[in-house]
Swiss-Prot record:
Family as reported in the entry's similarity comment: Belongs to the CemA family.
UniProt organism field: Aethionema grandiflorum
Superkingdom in the source lineage: Eukaryota
Name of the protein this chain belongs to: Potassium/proton antiporter CemA
Record flagged with keyword Metal-binding: no
InterPro entries: CemA (IPR004282)
Length: 229
């Protein structure tokens, strides 16, 4: 009976880890098909941010320049002009299709992540007792570690998150989150997040050491600074 009670929180933890993947897999076909039909049949107002609007304007300007070039080539045979106009028409249709696919992709991923968040929040709310048991297990495990091991783990975690080589890792992680939510890759936004987020984490971590660890375990702070130096 005791083993069964101990196994239930562990099974609950595994289900939380794999739940988002399972939701994404279930919604992949049904939700995407519904969003595609909704987008293609209903005349929706398109909301564009400044970067997307600039990109669209640049593409339309390129198409306009091609049409102007078409007017300048009227001395060419009519058959060549018809082929040229047909190519421009195909490019325009292709551009519209790509834009629609991008909007559908964005709506689909945002909806999937929103559904996952709501379900996981409800799942966690109804399983507070199991989460409390898992939290007590983690605290007991960390408490039984020596101060040297704790200092080593803290140093390893901080070097991974806010160390010298961390910007590349943050760039990959933020880029993955952008892709998961269906957003386009914007270098300016990505650079801004990579340059500011580790700094904020570093400040929070130093404040945590000053306020919490100095009071709870001064020896751990001494060992941490000795290893860090």
């Amino acid at each position: 009976m005791a083993k069964k009670k101990a196994f239930i929180p562990f099974l609950y933890f595994i289900s939380i880890v794999f739940f988002p993947w399972w939701i994404s897999l279930c919604c992949n076909k049904s939700l995407k098909t519904w969003i595609t039909n909704w987008w293609n049949t209903r005349q929706c107002e398109t909301f564009l941010n400044e970067i997307q609007e600039k990109s669209l304007l640049e593409k339309f300007i390129q198409l306009e320049e091609l049409f102007q070039l078409d007017e300048m080539l009227k001395e060419y045979p009519e058959t060549d002009l018809q082929k040229f106009r047909l190519e421009i028409h195909k490019e325009t249709i292709q551009f519209i299709k790509i834009h629609n696919e991008y909007r559908i992709h964005t709506i689909f991923h945002f909806s999937t992540n929103l559904i996952s968040f709501v379900i996981l929040s409800s799942y966690s709310f109804w399983g507070k007792e199991k989460l409390f048991i898992l939290n007590s297990w983690v605290q007991e495990f960390l408490y039984n570690l020596s101060d040297t091991i704790k200092a080593f783990l803290i140093l390893l975690l901080t070097d991974l998150c806010i160390g010298f080589h961390s910007p590349h890792g943050w760039e990959l992680m933020i880029g993955y989150i952008y892709k998961d939510f269906g957003f386009a890759h914007y270098e300016q936004i990505l650079s801004g997040l990579v340059s500011t987020f580790p700094v904020i984490l570093d400040t929070i971590f130093k404040y945590w050491i000053f306020r919490y660890l100095n009071r709870v375990s001064p020896s751990l702070v001494v060992i941490y600074h000795a290893i860090n130096d």
